[in-house]
């Protein structure tokens, strides 16, 4: 089974090169969404969690970055520990874990597990970055030569010839990433990753 996830953080990391264990460098998470597909790519679980703010205030910049309103956050926010435990339960049901820009998403998420002192199985799974694996498929020219990594909005537009809304919202992004993964998988663009199936 496949778990596709996306999270929204309240800001950018201080540095993308530092490990997630440096929790001062990695931002807090405000929104986590994931979808689990069975071997036939049919959804069997669909989770969407807004996280209640802990140690920070919701600013207009955060609202814009996460595409969530302060009212929604206050109404729907859940304790971080509850969300982290629910995600790890989802991990236990999956063999493959995917995300667009996996390194960013997994580091934000893993830093939260460290902060809460909760064990998890994320790094014990086969993990795949949809952004990196779709680079040759998209063939978007880089300014420095070769191809650049596509954003999820670019990948979605190339596959489906249309945009989705609102980008940068974890819920919308994970739906888009799941649609793109299914299209690429069914189009045999990812066969080298799953040749044991």
Please place each PLM-identified region on the residue numbering:
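Short acidic, Gly/Ser-rich segments with clustered Asp/Glu that frequently serve as metal-coordination loops
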Residues: 7-16, 20-22
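Metal-dependent phosphoesterase core characteristic of DEDDh/y 3'-5' exonuclease domains
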Residues: 15, 26-68, 88-197
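Extreme N-terminal starter segment of soluble prokaryotic enzymes
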Residues: 1-3
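Metal-dependent phosphoesterase signature
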Residues: 63-86
């Amino acid at each position: 089974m496949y778990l596709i996830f996306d999270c929204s953080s309240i800001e950018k990391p201080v540095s993308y090169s530092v490990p997630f264990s440096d929790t001062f460098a990695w931002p807090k998470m405000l929104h986590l969404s994931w979808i689990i597909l069975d071997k036939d790519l049919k959804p069997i679980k669909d989770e969407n969690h807004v996280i209640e703010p802990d140690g920070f205030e919701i600013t207009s910049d955060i609202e814009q970055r996460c595409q969530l309103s302060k009212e929604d956050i206050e109404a729907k926010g859940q304790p971080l520990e509850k969300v982290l435990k629910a995600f790890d339960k989802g991990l236990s049901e999956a063999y493959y874990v995917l995300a667009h820009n996996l390194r960013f998403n997994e580091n934000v998420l893993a830093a939260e597990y460290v902060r809460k002192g909760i064990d998890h199985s994320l790094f014990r799974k086969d993990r795949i970055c949809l952004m990196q694996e779709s680079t040759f498929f998209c063939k978007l020219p880089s300014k420095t030569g070769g191809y650049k990594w596509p954003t999820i909005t670019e990948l979605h537009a190339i596959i489906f010839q249309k945009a989705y809304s609102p980008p940068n919202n974890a819920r919308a992004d994970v739906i888009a990433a799941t649609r793109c993964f299914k299209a690429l998988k069914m189009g045999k663009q990812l066969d080298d990753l799953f040749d044991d199936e």
